[in-house]
A protein has these predicted regions:
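Outer-membrane beta-barrel porins/channels
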Residues: 19-30, 37-41, 58-61, 66-271
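Alpha-helix capping/hinge segments and adjacent helical runs
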Residues: 34-36, 42, 47-53
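Short, basic/polar N-terminal leader/transit segment immediately after the initiator methionine
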Residues: 2-5, 22-24
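Sec-dependent N-terminal signal peptides
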Residues: 4-14
């Protein structure tokens, strides 16, 4: 644990701001690509763009762990389950940020469907809850997110996603703690089976546009190298992925110039 760094963050940002409600992205592959992931179909599409679930033809599940700035109290754990059926694809997700007296939970139920060979859409109902000493009496709240993916061909994919358009939030003793709406749009191009380049822009209320880019390449079969950059402030990301039969394992690292390294790992299964 990095107690001095945690104390410093609390002093600079304050408890309420540091632990403000947030929709945390998950998946070590996504983190390694600087979360430029709005157009990518993946086990963790339940946290990025539910439209990506429509591209799944088989059951998939994953578990994820992240240690923000290598501080145990700021850890993030998550799980995702994808179940294709005749009518479309269901997704179930859960995440928990924090540890000890502070915990922030998100539960999601998603449904996605291919509207045509090129257009895919998805929607997810979310329930957020948060607990720490200053808001022990706070209640959770429900919201939703929805997205679309368009693929004019087998190499180019374009995606758009909006989270919490109703700007819901938790009622506390100090008033309503709102959660910002987030809009993301971007795309990726698969040059061949070895190279993928992804670009995304994100807009959150009262904050500047955030540009995110990532590149993934396979020097050999089943082994992926990933790099990304986003800002401002500038964050650099990198990671590896390895697949063996029906299991893939990814590790990702994000580096913040002032706050340090955030390591992550995820494991995905397909049946």
């Amino acid at each position: 644990m990095k107690r001095p760094l945690l104390t410093f963050l609390l002093f600079i940002f304050g408890l309420s701001k540091l632990f403000a409600l947030e929709n945390h992205p998950t998946g070590a592959r996504s983190l390694a690509l600087s979360n430029a992931f709005v157009s990518i179909s993946d086990t963790w599409s339940t946290f990025h763009n539910q439209a990506g679930l429509a591209l799944f033809k088989q059951f998939s599940a994953g578990v994820y762990y992240e240690s923000k700035f290598a501080i145990e109290e700021l850890s993030l754990t998550a799980s995702s389950l994808i179940l294709p059926v005749n009518a479309g694809t269901f997704g179930f997700s859960f995440s928990q940020f924090g540890k000890g007296s502070f915990k922030e939970n998100k539960v999601g139920l998603a449904f996605a469907k291919s509207l045509s060979e090129k257009i895919h859409a998805g929607i997810q109902l979310d329930y957020f809850s948060q607990r720490f000493p200053e808001n022990s009496n706070a209640f959770g709240f429900a919201t939703f997110e929805t997205g679309i993916i368009y693929s004019p061909n087998k190499k180019l994919f374009l995606g758009a996603h909006i989270f919490n358009p109703i700007s819901g939030g938790i009622e506390t003793n100090e008033g309503k703690q709102k959660m910002s709406a987030i809009f993301r749009v971007g795309g990726h191009y698969q040059f061949d089976e070895m190279i993928l380049i992804s670009v995304e822009t994100q807009k959150e209320a009262e904050t500047p546009f955030l540009i995110k880019t990532g590149i993934e390449f396979y020097p050999v079969q089943n082994l992926a190298f990933r790099f990304g950059v986003s800002g401002k402030p500038v964050n650099y990301t990198t990671g590896l992925g390895y697949g063996f039969r029906k299991v893939t394992t990814d590790i990702g690292f994000s580096y913040h110039g002032n706050l340090g390294l955030t390591p992550s790992i995820s494991v995905q299964f397909k049946l």
